From Swiss-Prot:
Domain of life: Eukaryota
Ranges annotated as biased composition (Polar residues): 110-122
Record protein name field: Kappa-casein
GO biological process: lactation; protein stabilization
Function: Kappa-casein stabilizes micelle formation, preventing casein precipitation in milk.
Residues annotated as signal peptide: none
Annotated region described as Disordered, given as residue ranges: 99-122
Family from the record: Belongs to the kappa-casein family.
Amino acid sequence: VALINNQFLPYPYYAKPGAVRSPAQILQWQVLPNTVPAKSCQAQPTTLARHPHPRLSFMAIPPKKNQDKTDIPTINTIATVESTITPTTEAIVDTVATPEASSEVIESAPETNTDQVTSTVV
């Protein structure tokens, strides 16, 4: 702890070395008031020039690592539009060409098998 005795400060202020403080707290120590302190400070000339510690809600606290904990699946919270399921009928055409070695000219169409398939589209 170093005593800061400056001609611009009306009372001596104590400052802790910055090596043991976090960067956020170092900035708090570097800004010292150079105006006349409030009446509560005038009654106690050895008051430390420090700001109160930030509340815990402002501090970053890492989560506890629990190895027994199972993974929680992520849930998509984006609202999806529910659509009505409508059955559709699609015709699947299976074209089979029979490669027969023939000298005859075949003028008919190739064999086709048509199957009816019913699927649901979402």
